[in-house]
């Protein structure tokens, strides 16, 4: 689950991570009133959307008067802000964060993530702040420093100081930076985060360390013990299809292609998308129905896939391990009839009761194209979609 920058900064502030003072506003008039509450002559007007790259896209403005705050607020509110993370359609700006300006001496990047290679939380940092970390990794990987954290000990003070030293924070501010990083690590652990990222973290002219940004992603599987965080969820920032999918324990992520995918298991789903790409197609989604797919879940999965107007065909790729292929086949037949499917449909089944499942599909009389392998299924759906 994602939250807005201003919400992330409230969490930071409550856990001892220094941030500038700021207020959220939903109208231009409110933006001016909130700016009046700040003890500053320079204001930063920030568009609040669930996407990075806002600064480069014109979503962050520096105002030196209340009239400029109002002008920038009017400019940003209601605007479709297009960044490298939103796609070409962009996201509508519905709220702003009005923040005190900071005396920036130097910008840095810091982030905590889960490193799948070590199964540990890893602290990453770079002195190339204000730049996308992926860009730094591609062009100057030697400028990214990492500390792998022992879950029993936590982020040790010597590790925090070492990374501060490595990214060239001045020696007089290293202890402040170390304290900052330890507080940030505590946010990551106590709030069950999957990502905590600040870009930029800044060193001020007075030698203080501040978080000028706040990107926090939470582990959805841990939200049951964070009711306060659940209340921060902004459904308007999420894909309605993803929201609907979550109601049925379906993992759905929309993509830009035209071939709908329904698969069980995240690994098989990614392999299916790669195979479609390999044969010249473009997946329209990632959809994992999980290990306990029922007729109802399969039907809802079809409805969600068909909710994307770009979809021109569907590839169902199911391995029946825990699930029986005959049950899945019955669900597919019932779902196709209920949604009155007219698009090309290719189904590949393998596993428990696979022959019975294939017979059910064959006897249905529906226009379901069978496939013996994932590669064959991908080739068939790519060809059929191109003929539509």
Swiss-Prot record:
The keyword ATP-binding applies. Mg(2+) binds at residues 199, 213. Its cofactor is Mg(2+). It catalyses: succinate + ATP + CoA = succinyl-CoA + ADP + phosphate; GTP + succinate + CoA = succinyl-CoA + GDP + phosphate. GO terms for cellular component: cytosol; succinate-CoA ligase complex. Pathway: Carbohydrate metabolism; tricarboxylic acid cycle; succinate from succinyl-CoA (ligase route): step 1/1. Its EC number is 6.2.1.5. Residues 9-244 form the ATP-grasp domain. Binds 1 Mg(2+) ion per subunit. GO terms for biological process: succinyl-CoA metabolic process; tricarboxylic acid cycle. GO terms for molecular function: ATP binding; magnesium ion binding; succinate-CoA ligase (ADP-forming) activity; succinate-CoA ligase (GDP-forming) activity. Substrate binds at residues 264, 321-323. ATP binds at residues 46, 53-55, 99, 102, 107. Keywords: ATP-binding, Ligase, Magnesium, Metal-binding, Nucleotide-binding, Tricarboxylic acid cycle. HAMAP family: Succ_CoA_beta. Belongs to the succinate/malate CoA ligase beta subunit family. Heterotetramer of two alpha and two beta subunits. Succinyl-CoA synthetase functions in the citric acid cycle (TCA), coupling the hydrolysis of succinyl-CoA to the synthesis of either ATP or GTP and thus represents the only step of substrate-level phosphorylation in the TCA. The beta subunit provides nucleotide specificity of the enzyme and binds the substrate succinate, while the binding sites for coenzyme A and phosphate are found in the alpha subunit. NCBIfam families: PRK00696.1, sucCoAbeta. This is Succinate--CoA ligase [ADP-forming] subunit beta. It comes from Staphylococcus carnosus (strain TM300). The gene is sucC.
């Amino acid at each position: 689950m994602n939250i807005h920058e201003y919400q992330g900064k409230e969490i930071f502030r409550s856990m001892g991570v220094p941030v500038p003072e700021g207020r959220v506003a939903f109208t231009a008039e409110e933006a001016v009133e909130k700016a009046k509450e700040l003890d500053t002559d320079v204001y930063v007007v920030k568009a609040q959307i669930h996407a990075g790259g806002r600064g480069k896209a014109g979503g962050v403005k520096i105002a030196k008067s209340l009239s400029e705050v109002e002008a920038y607020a009017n400019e940003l509110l209601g605007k479709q802000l297009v960044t490298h993370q939103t796609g070409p359609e962009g996201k509508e700006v519905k709220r702003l964060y009005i923040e005190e300006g900071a005396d920036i001496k130097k910008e840095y990047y810091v982030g905590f993530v889960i490193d799948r290679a070590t199964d540990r939380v890893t602290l990453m940092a770079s002195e190339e702040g204000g730049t996308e970390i992926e860009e730094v990794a591609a062009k100057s990987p030697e400028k990214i420093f990492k500390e792998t954290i022992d879950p029993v000990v936590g982020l040790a003070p010597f590790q925090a100081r070492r990374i501060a030293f490595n990214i060239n924070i001045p020696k007089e501010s290293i202890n402040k930076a170390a304290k900052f990083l330890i507080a940030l690590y505590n946010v990551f652990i106590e709030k069950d985060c999957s990502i905590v990222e600040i870009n930029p973290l800044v060193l001020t002219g007075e030698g203080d360390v501040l978080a000028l940004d706040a990107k926090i992603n939470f582990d959805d599987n841990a939200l049951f013990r964070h009711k306060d965080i659940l209340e921060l969820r902004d459904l308007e920032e999420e894909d309605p299809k993803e929201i609907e999918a979550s109601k049925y324990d379906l993992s759905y992520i929309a993509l830009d292609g035209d071939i709908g995918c329904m698969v069980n298991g995240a690994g098989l789903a990614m392999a299916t998308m790669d195979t479609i790409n390999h044969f010249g197609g473009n997946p329209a989604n990632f959809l994992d129905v999980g290990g306990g797919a029922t007729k109802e879940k399969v039907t809802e999965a079809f409805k969600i896939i068909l909710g994307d107007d770009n979809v021109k065909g569907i590839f169902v790729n199911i391995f029946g391990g825990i699930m029986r292929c005959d049950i899945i086949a019955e669900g597919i037949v019932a779902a196709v009839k209920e949604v009155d499917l007219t698009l090309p449909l290719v189904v590949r089944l393998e596993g428990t009761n696979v022959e019975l499942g294939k017979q059910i599909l064959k006897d249905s009389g529906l226009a379901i194209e069978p496939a013996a392998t994932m590669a064959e299924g991908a080739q068939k759906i790519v060809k059929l979609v191109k003929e539509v």
